[in-house]
Each structure stands twice: as structure tokens, then as C-alpha cells.
């Protein structure tokens, strides 16, 4: 076919035009075309629910149900608590030790510790007294320990036991009450530092240690 004869062939034109659409024929078939305004109106008329609206509704319903449950629980809790009487436990009275039990404890402690102190004092001599007086008269030394036990018996026990403990504490050792030999920095320390008649002092202390044996027999 020549190009000139192809160009001269005319395509069929639309046979009718009506309002919103145009109708024509192409290759023996009818073709219609809607206008853009009508297409827009058709889209606007469609009703579709937005995606996710049903899920959001379920979540809101669930949260509302939980909130109502929590509120109901709190109301019941306060309602029940308001009807229950408040019970305050009665204070437990402090158990004070009786004088008898305290006295027995003092006796027991003296019975356990005095024998050890008595044994150490029975071996005392002038040299040991001068060299170790500070150690013997502090802490758990035999002078401090034995005097402390005698003071406990004198203060918290009665009868013959109290009288015997008091006699031991007030017995002079080289003119100084035995109770002062269990401390340092006083008259006993000054006497030991002088070095005078330490043998006599040691012997008198040993005599008091033997006298403590009577305390043990009275317990």
C-alpha cells in the first residue's frame, strides 16, 4: 500500500455526543467515555468504612471494660474496709527481771570467774606486783576482775554473802583498801611505784584471795 493512500483513509468520527459521555465506533466497536465530573461524583457517592475502624472500636471497648472493673474493685475495697473495726494489738508489757533472778545471775558469774582470779593472785609476789600491777588492775586482770565480782555480790546479794564481800573490799592492803588496788592512777599505783614493802602487799593480797573461797561456799 502506498503511503499516500494510507493517509487519505479517514477514521470514523463519533456519531453522537450527549451531555456527559461521547459515543463512537472504532474498528467496528462502540466506545463510550465518561466526563471527569461524572467520574468524580461516582467516587464521592461510594461509602466504604476506613481501614482499622473496627480494631479501634474493639480496643476502646476493651479499655472501657477494664476501667469499669478497676473502679468497681476500688469501690468494693473502701466499702468493705469502712465496716471493719480497726483492731489495735495490745502492747506487750516489758518483762523486767526479778531481783531474785538478777541476784542468781550475779552469783553464777562470780562462781565461774572468781576461781581463775584467785589462782592468779595466790602466785603473786613482790616482783610480779611491781612489774604487772597496771596489767592486773585493768581489763580482765586478776585484781580488777576479783574486785569487780566482789562489788557485784556486795551490791546485789544480801545476807552473809553481802557482808563477806564488803569485808574483803574494805580490808586494807598496806593501808590502802583492797578495792583501790583494782584501779590505776590512784593510791595503789603510787604505792607500787615507790617500791616499799611490796612483799608485804603481795602477801596481804594473797590472804584476801584465800578469803574469797568463803564467798564461793556461801553461793
Swiss-Prot record:
Q: Which stretches does the entry tag as region Disordered?
A: 1-37
MF terms per GO, please? GTPase activator activity
Q: Where in the cell is it found?
A: Cell outer membrane
Domain of life here? Bacteria
The Gene Ontology CC terms held by the record are: cell outer membrane
What turns on expression? At 37 degrees Celsius in the absence of calcium.
Q: What's the protein called, per UniProt? A: Outer membrane virulence protein YopE
This protein's encoding gene: yopE
Amino acid at each position: 500500500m502506498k503511503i499516500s493512500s494510507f493517509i487519505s483513509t479517514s477514521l470514523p468520527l463519533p456519531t453522537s455526543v450527549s451531555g456527559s459521555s461521547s459515543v463512537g465506533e472504532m474498528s467496528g466497536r462502540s466506545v463510550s467515555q465518561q466526563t471527569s465530573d461524572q467520574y468524580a461524583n461516582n467516587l464521592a457517592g461510594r461509602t466504604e468504612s476506613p481501614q482499622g475502624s473496627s480494631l479501634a472500636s474493639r480496643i476502646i471497648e476493651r479499655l472501657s471494660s477494664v476501667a469499669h472493673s478497676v473502679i468497681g474493685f476500688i469501690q468494693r475495697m473502701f466499702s468493705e474496709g469502712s465496716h471493719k473495726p480497726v483492731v489495735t494489738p495490745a502492747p506487750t508489757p516489758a518483762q523486767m527481771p526479778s531481783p531474785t533472778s538478777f541476784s542468781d545471775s550475779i552469783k553464777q558469774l562470780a562462781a565461774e570467774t572468781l576461781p581463775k582470779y584467785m589462782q592468779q593472785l595466790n602466785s603473786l609476789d613482790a616482783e610480779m606486783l611491781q612489774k604487772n600491777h597496771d596489767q592486773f588492775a585493768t581489763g580482765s586482770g586478776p585484781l580488777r576482775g576479783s574486785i569487780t565480782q566482789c562489788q557485784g555480790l556486795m551490791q546485789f546479794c544480801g545476807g552473809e554473802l553481802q557482808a563477806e564481800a564488803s569485808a574483803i573490799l574494805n580490808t586494807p592492803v598496806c593501808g590502802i583498801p583492797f578495792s583501790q588496788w583494782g584501779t590505776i592512777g590512784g593510791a595503789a599505783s603510787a604505792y607500787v611505784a615507790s617500791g616499799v614493802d611490796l612483799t608485804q602487799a603481795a602477801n596481804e593480797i594473797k590472804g584476801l584471795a584465800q578469803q574469797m573461797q568463803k564467798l564461793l561456799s556461801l553461793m
